[in-house]
């Protein structure tokens, strides 16, 4: 199972994130979407998570990827 970051209402996915400039690029081709590790998302319902992009983090003993800040983006499982 892959984890992608998808627009809540459109068929577009995050393709890449440039952390230096803050630019996020999107694609409508699911095969070009950035895939994230699924361990952090394993216990979450995709509709409850809002996303910006993912970056490594460690908090409260959990290691994984942190997502936040753009409500129209959601975690999407394939």
Please name every model-derived segment:
Residues 34-78:
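Short, mixed-charge low-complexity intrinsically disordered segments
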Residues 2-29:
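Short aromatic-glycine-(Arg/Gly/Cys) micro-motifs in beta-strand/loop hairpins
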